């Protein structure tokens, strides 16, 4: 004889359960931003933009001039993990080269 467990809901034969559609949100995006300082050479900033952000020389120069004139410039917009990785790579490279260049991420 089969026993029924107490407090366990029983389904009728032929009942079809509907699967609820999951609404996935796009990931949060972050801007990677270089901050101006009076010591890091402009050519080093251009090299960083080319090496870590795949910018051509002309675009890298324009971003570098924005950093110089306005105090900061956006290098690119990425998901959180990619942005954090780029910030760490740039900061480490600048530190190893003896430059005080700062790179931060901001919510886009």
Curated annotation (Swiss-Prot):
Residues spanning the signal sequence: none
InterPro entries named in the record: ClpS, ClpS_core, Ribosomal_bL12_C/ClpS-like
GO biological process, one term: proteolysis
Classification via PANTHER family: ATP-DEPENDENT CLP PROTEASE ADAPTER PROTEIN CLPS, ATP-DEPENDENT CLP PROTEASE ADAPTER PROTEIN CLPS1, CHLOROPLASTIC
UniProt family annotation: Belongs to the ClpS family.
Quaternary context: Binds to the N-terminal domain of the chaperone ClpA.
Protein name, UniProt field: ATP-dependent Clp protease adapter protein ClpS
């Amino acid at each position: 004889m089969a026993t029924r467990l107490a407090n366990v809901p029983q389904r009728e034969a032929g009942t079809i359960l509907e699967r609820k559609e999951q609404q996935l949100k796009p990931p949060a995006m972050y801007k990677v931003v270089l901050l101006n300082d009076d010591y890091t050479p402009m050519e080093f900033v251009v090299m960083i933009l080319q090496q870590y952000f795949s910018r051509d020389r002309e675009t890298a120069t324009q971003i570098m001039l924005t950093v110089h004139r306005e105090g900061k410039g956006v290098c690119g917009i990425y998901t959180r993990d990619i942005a954090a990785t780029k910030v760490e790579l740039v900061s480490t490279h600048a530190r190893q080269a003896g430059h005080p260049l700062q790179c931060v991420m901001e919510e886009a």
